[in-house]
């Protein structure tokens, strides 16, 4: 199979943040365009020696670490599966706009720093949460089981063009610099 990859894509959401005065931005870690499908991968790193708990439909996940005193400290983190599913839907919509046909899109959460034994997640069927060592095998599995006439890779140029067109990162940096400049001018004027 052939693959193309886009890393660190930033896309504007439909959620307006009134405090910031702009639409919220989603950060897609990796978009992998394979022969048969598009894979939207969210990478999450956890400290070693913790246990991860949660489910697909929970708002948050938790990881617990044991201290030397045999106490357990819980830390709340965003549900990476839920977040990545919404990213995947958006990327699939863009892909459909780019090539005027449905493209299979698969959301995968890639967990770094933990083993399977440390992950205690109740994940819905069709959702993928894998450790780093299993990520490539998971993508190979889908590439061998999905039959979509190589629709994804065949149109990779159109898909990449669309994903890059919709990216807002290049537009955000000048806005941030503009806001910083205005703030510095304001501080100077208020001295």
Model-based region annotation:
Residues 1-26, 33, 37-38, 44-55, ...:
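Surface-exposed interaction regions that form or flank ligand-binding interfaces
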């Amino acid at each position: 199979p052939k693959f193309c990859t886009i890393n660190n894509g930033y896309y504007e959401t439909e959620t307006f943040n009134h405090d910031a005065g702009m639409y919220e931005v989603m950060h897609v870690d990796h978009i992998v365009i394979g022969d048969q499908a598009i894979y939207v991968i969210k990478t999450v790193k956890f400290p070693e020696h913790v246990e991860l708990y949660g489910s697909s439909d929970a708002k948050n996940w938790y990881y617990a670490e044991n201290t030397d005193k045999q106490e357990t400290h819980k830390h709340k983190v965003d549900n990476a599966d839920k977040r990545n599913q919404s990213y995947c839907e958006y990327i699939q919509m863009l892909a459909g706009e780019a090539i005027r046909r449905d493209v299979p899109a698969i959301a995968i959460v890639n967990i770094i720093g933990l083993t399977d034994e440390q992950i205690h997640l109740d994940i819905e069927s069709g959702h993928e949460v894998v450790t780093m060592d299993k990520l490539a095998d998971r993508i190979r599995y889908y590439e061998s089981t999905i039959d979509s006439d190589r629709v994804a890779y065949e149109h990779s140029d159109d898909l990449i063009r669309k994903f890059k067109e919709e990216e807002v990162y290049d537009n955000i940096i000048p806005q941030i610099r503009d806001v910083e400049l205005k703030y510095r001018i304001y501080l100077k004027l208020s001295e």
